[in-house]
Amino acid sequence: PIGTDWSRLFEAGYVQEPEVRIRYLPWGDDVAQNEWAHAEGRDRHRVAAENPEKVAETRRLLDAHPDASALVFVDWLDQGEALAEALDVPFVSGEMPHHRRDRVFESFRAGDLDTVVVSRVGDEGIDLPNAEVAIVASGLGGSRRQGAQRAGRTMRPAGGSRVYVLATRGTSEEEFAQRQMRHLAEKGIRVIESNVDDGAGSGDDVE
């Protein structure tokens, strides 16, 4: 439950503690960075969220966990569609008919699908399946409750689990990520921050 002191559940052995890693990314190209520099308000948040480097980093993280089930969370439809196309996986959004959404999640639970990209609809009362890996590719401006829900998707009775939070370096995403992760740390979840170097792959061990 969101209001629960998760550290007590971990100590009692009821759930496996997830590990949360915030990964600060460089811009994927100068075009996106220039667009962000000239954007304002909501558009600025969108451009930071849609940083092309997040596609490459998501691929690297999924490659590092080849046998794990993974949910990739986004707040922007264009970003979700681009990620789903790049990864060749389904994108579940509020625009998807309920019967199709149910089929996707049934396939995910059955192990026929390893990865699903999910829009904010996944945080709004939908019975999402649990996953071994969660990648938060955008949505860093959301509430602390939303951040807690997304981390909670990887809480399992046994086995390891990981949450990766992708934030574009030098933008408001850094502040949002740190704010949400402080909230998770207060609940007993271990949080690790790392910088992904320009052109240097994932920057640290993601195993």
Regions found by a protein language model. Give the residues of each.
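Switch/connector loops and helix/strand junctions flanking conserved nucleotide-binding motifs
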Residues: 125-128, 142-148, 171-178
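A short beta-strand element within the Helicase C-terminal
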Residues: 115-117, 124-139, 161-166
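Conserved helicase ATPase core of P-loop NTP-dependent helicases/translocases
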Residues: 71-73, 78-82, 88-123
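Long, largely alpha-helical accessory region at the distal end of helicase-like NTP-driven motors
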Residues: 64, 69-70, 191-207
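Post-DEXD/H (motif II) to motif III coupling segment of the RecA-like Helicase ATP-binding lobe
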Residues: 1-20
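Short glycine-/polar-rich loops that comprise or flank the Walker A/P-loop
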Residues: 15-19, 129-133, 157-163, 187-189
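Conserved interdomain hinge at the start of the Helicase C-terminal
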Residues: 32-85
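Conserved segment of the helicase C-terminal RecA-like domain
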Residues: 153-183
